[in-house]
Amino acid sequence: MNIAIAGASGRMGRMLIEQVLNTEGVTLSGALDVPGSPALGQDAGLFLGRNTGVAITADLEAGLAGADCLIDFTRPEGTLVHLAAAKQLGVKMVVGTTGFDEAGKAALAEAAKSIGIVFAANFSVGVNATFKLLEVAAKLLSTGYDIEVIEAHHRFKVDAPSGTALKMGEVIADALGRDLKTCGVFAREGHTGERDPNSIGFATIRGGDIVGDHTVMFAGIGERIEISHKSSSRQSYADGAVRSARFLADKPTGLFDMQDVLGLK
């Protein structure tokens, strides 16, 4: 399978390139970056001291030439541009970008009628196992427990709460028969009054180089249960993304998530 990487000079882009180069059965066929990037024209493996023969380019058609799948962990506005090109060229996509609005999510769903897409809030196997644990816990602790989602990320992250935190909230809300759009509480300040027992609260921390910490607290009277996942490296995300690309090999169309890739549905 031939794989192209978007955001090739970024932290996640470099991790993805390294993962592709170190995975049997896949080949790096293209590397994309934004116009004006100082990395344009460089070999995609330069940061590793390896010559891949793939030059980083801002030309979407050139970067996607020969690709079976594009892996994109960039920003919503960039991903949507890449999505349009991939759809036109028949290139499948693995999308790890977070922060999409409803229109962006609808565009992904529409494109999935033409190409195979894996779109997930988090590509870590551990995080996706945590989603299943939260589903079970929410059903067991459906009454008498207040639910709070606390997440922490590095200072450079531009969206909040994280896509993973929101997915955790959605999993819990679905398990309880609630709608996160109406029960989610994303800010508290001043005299807020007593806590709504049906609400799901979110707290966001940004600082330093934290890769990603997520804790869901089920707080009852006299006891508290916490389910946590802490990432020490982006390696698990890169591994899951390449695994997702391979999953799409026999999927000409359709919108999938990491639960599909792992067979957890």
UniProtKB/Swiss-Prot annotation:
Q: Which GO terms describe its cellular component?
A: cytosol
Spell out the CDD domains in the cross-references: DHDPR_N (cd02274)
**Record bears the keyword Signal:** no
GO terms in the biological process aspect are: diaminopimelate biosynthetic process; lysine biosynthetic process via diaminopimelate
Keywords in alphabetical order:
Amino-acid biosynthesis, Cytoplasm, Diaminopimelate biosynthesis, Lysine biosynthesis, NAD, NADP, Oxidoreductase
Subcellular location per UniProt equals: Cytoplasm
Which sites bind NAD(+)?
7-12, 33, 96-98, 120-123
Q: Which residues bind (S)-2,3,4,5-tetrahydrodipicolinate?
A: 154, 163-164
Q: What is its EC number?
A: 1.17.1.8
- Residues in the active site? 153 (proton donor/acceptor), 157 (proton donor)
- Answer whether the UniProt record assigns the keyword rRNA processing to this protein: no
Taxonomically, the superkingdom here is Bacteria
Please report a single Pfam family linked to this protein: DapB_N
Gene Ontology terms, MF aspect = 4-hydroxy-tetrahydrodipicolinate reductase; NAD binding; NADP binding; oxidoreductase activity, acting on CH or CH2 groups, NAD or NADP as acceptor
Q: By its UniProt entry, which PROSITE patterns does this protein fall under?
A: DAPB
The catalysed reaction is: (S)-2,3,4,5-tetrahydrodipicolinate + NAD(+) + H2O = (2S,4S)-4-hydroxy-2,3,4,5-tetrahydrodipicolinate + NADH + H(+); (S)-2,3,4,5-tetrahydrodipicolinate + NADP(+) + H2O = (2S,4S)-4-hydroxy-2,3,4,5-tetrahydrodipicolinate + NADPH + H(+)
Group of enzyme by EC: oxidoreductase
Q: Which family does it belong to?
A: Belongs to the DapB family.
Q: What does this protein do?
A: Catalyzes the conversion of 4-hydroxy-tetrahydrodipicolinate (HTPA) to tetrahydrodipicolinate.
Q: Which PANTHER family match?
A: 4-HYDROXY-TETRAHYDRODIPICOLINATE REDUCTASE 1, CHLOROPLASTIC-RELATED, DIHYDRODIPICOLINATE REDUCTASE
Q: What is this protein called?
A: 4-hydroxy-tetrahydrodipicolinate reductase
What is the organism field in this record? Cupriavidus taiwanensis (strain DSM 17343 / BCRC 17206 / CCUG 44338 / CIP 107171 / LMG 19424 / R1) (Ralstonia taiwanensis (strain LMG 19424))
